[in-house]
Amino acid sequence: MDRKIYVLGSGHNHPEHPDVVRCDILPGHGVDMVFDLDVIPWPIADGAAMEVNASHIMEHLKNPCRFMDELWRITYPGGQVYIETPDAANFDLAWCDPTHKRPFRLHTFLNYFTVIGVHRLPTVKHGWEF
């Protein structure tokens, strides 16, 4: 199987590359696959992804646990998953967008990963100060 990098919620911001599959809920220039991340299962084969990028997507979804389950289903063992969300500790960032359904904290992910048996994860926390 030719494993790819899947960019979820790509919009039109990601350059074309033969190893990258850009996914979004809306069709448009720069979108390779159109589907709704809230509709499970996704039209991606088990283990098809060597890497999945989900930047500022989870806070918009109805069921983040089902989203996480699908991430693990499509990522082959040893693959990488990158998730970025606004931190719930920053109230303005977490809730300034009216389409945000819920905020997240680092412990949200650590608890989920422990339940599914992932024990060591590199994490990066960054914030902006003005």
List the predicted regions and their residue ranges.
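Conserved SAM-binding loop
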Residues: 3-90
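S-adenosyl-L-methionine-dependent methyltransferase catalytic module, highlighting the catalytic core
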Residues: 65-72, 76, 80-130
